[in-house]
Amino acid sequence: FFQWSATVECHFLNGTERVRFLVRHVYNRQQYVHFDSDVGLFVADTVLGEPSAKLFNSQPDVLEKNRAAVEMLCNYNYEIVAPLTLQRREPKVRIFALQSGSLPQTDRLACYVTGFYPPEIEVKWFQNGQEETERVVSTDVIQNGDWTYQVLVVLEISPRHGDSYVCQVEHTSLQQPITQRWEPPGDVSRSKLLMGVGGFVLGLVYLALGIFFFLCSKKGQPDPTSPGILN
């Protein structure tokens, strides 16, 4: 089984200030000859590539076509692609609690980050304010197919009462990191219960004050049934 392939590359420095065009010829996963616009010729990378380089360089039309690719291919496509590739997209972050079938409680947290561009991103897990690095597993950054990317970062946990977990995301599109917080369900329910009780007690206090001021105002008014002075 033999495999041959060729790749075409455009390298840009400071926009189109300096453009380099490359064509790489690969045989069985080994590059044997390539064209470099900085050189203007085909260059052999192995002994196998020497006859090919000699053949390509002996054909003026082949050389002219590859030399013209800097303008006709690289610069032309740069004007089309640059607005898309230079636009930054902010990531969206969600936390999912995962549970193994044999365990009665959550044992993993997944921080799902998607919709961001460029692909360089940093996702961190914190437990009770301390960064976790030992129990963290991450997928590669994956393309979404619309010039944006996604990544999944999973943290193994043994949740206890009072624990809090935070997923923090840093990206060039953000002025400050995004943080998503997760607490064990018991703690969340307890917090909601305490908030509900607190609100109920506060409501009773306001009700008592309202009744008190109402009664005071009634005492200060004259009784319309009391006998008055006849004029």
Curated annotation (Swiss-Prot):
<feature type="disulfide bond">
    <location>
        <begin position="111"/>
        <end position="167"/>
    </location>
</feature>
<dbReference type="GO" id="GO:0042613">
    <property type="term" value="C:MHC class II protein complex"/>
</dbReference>
<keyword id="KW-0391">Immunity</keyword>
<dbReference type="InterPro" id="IPR003597">
    <property type="entry name" value="Ig_C1-set"/>
</dbReference>
<feature type="glycosylation site" description="N-linked (GlcNAc...) asparagine">
    <location>
        <position position="14"/>
    </location>
</feature>
<dbReference type="GO" id="GO:0002503">
    <property type="term" value="P:peptide antigen assembly with MHC class II protein complex"/>
</dbReference>
<dbReference type="InterPro" id="IPR007110">
    <property type="entry name" value="Ig-like_dom"/>
</dbReference>
<dbReference type="Pfam" id="PF00969">
    <property type="entry name" value="MHC_II_beta"/>
</dbReference>
<keyword id="KW-0325">Glycoprotein</keyword>
<dbReference type="GO" id="GO:0050870">
    <property type="term" value="P:positive regulation of T cell activation"/>
</dbReference>
<dbReference type="InterPro" id="IPR011162">
    <property type="entry name" value="MHC_I/II-like_Ag-recog"/>
</dbReference>
<dbReference type="GO" id="GO:0050778">
    <property type="term" value="P:positive regulation of immune response"/>
</dbReference>
<dbReference type="GO" id="GO:0019886">
    <property type="term" value="P:antigen processing and presentation of exogenous peptide antigen via MHC class II"/>
</dbReference>
<dbReference type="InterPro" id="IPR000353">
    <property type="entry name" value="MHC_II_b_N"/>
</dbReference>
<feature type="disulfide bond">
    <location>
        <begin position="10"/>
        <end position="74"/>
    </location>
</feature>
<keyword id="KW-1133">Transmembrane helix</keyword>
<feature type="topological domain" description="Extracellular">
    <location>
        <begin position="1"/>
        <end position="194"/>
    </location>
</feature>
<dbReference type="GO" id="GO:0005765">
    <property type="term" value="C:lysosomal membrane"/>
</dbReference>
<dbReference type="Pfam" id="PF07654">
    <property type="entry name" value="C1-set"/>
</dbReference>
<dbReference type="GO" id="GO:0002250">
    <property type="term" value="P:adaptive immune response"/>
</dbReference>
<dbReference type="InterPro" id="IPR036179">
    <property type="entry name" value="Ig-like_dom_sf"/>
</dbReference>
<keyword id="KW-0491">MHC II</keyword>
<feature type="transmembrane region" description="Helical">
    <location>
        <begin position="195"/>
        <end position="219"/>
    </location>
</feature>
<keyword id="KW-1064">Adaptive immunity</keyword>
<dbReference type="InterPro" id="IPR003006">
    <property type="entry name" value="Ig/MHC_CS"/>
</dbReference>
<protein>
    <recommendedName>
        <fullName>Class II histocompatibility antigen, B-L beta chain</fullName>
    </recommendedName>
</protein>
<comment type="similarity">
    <text>Belongs to the MHC class II family.</text>
</comment>
<dbReference type="InterPro" id="IPR014745">
    <property type="entry name" value="MHC_II_a/b_N"/>
</dbReference>
<feature type="region of interest" description="Beta-1">
    <location>
        <begin position="1"/>
        <end position="89"/>
    </location>
</feature>
<feature type="domain" description="Ig-like C1-type">
    <location>
        <begin position="91"/>
        <end position="179"/>
    </location>
</feature>
<feature type="topological domain" description="Cytoplasmic">
    <location>
        <begin position="220"/>
        <end position="231"/>
    </location>
</feature>
<dbReference type="GO" id="GO:0042605">
    <property type="term" value="F:peptide antigen binding"/>
</dbReference>
<keyword id="KW-0812">Transmembrane</keyword>
<dbReference type="GO" id="GO:0023026">
    <property type="term" value="F:MHC class II protein complex binding"/>
</dbReference>
<dbReference type="InterPro" id="IPR050160">
    <property type="entry name" value="MHC/Immunoglobulin"/>
</dbReference>
<dbReference type="GO" id="GO:0031902">
    <property type="term" value="C:late endosome membrane"/>
</dbReference>
<feature type="region of interest" description="Beta-2">
    <location>
        <begin position="90"/>
        <end position="182"/>
    </location>
</feature>
<dbReference type="InterPro" id="IPR013783">
    <property type="entry name" value="Ig-like_fold"/>
</dbReference>
<feature type="region of interest" description="Connecting peptide">
    <location>
        <begin position="183"/>
        <end position="194"/>
    </location>
</feature>
<keyword id="KW-0472">Membrane</keyword>
<keyword id="KW-1015">Disulfide bond</keyword>
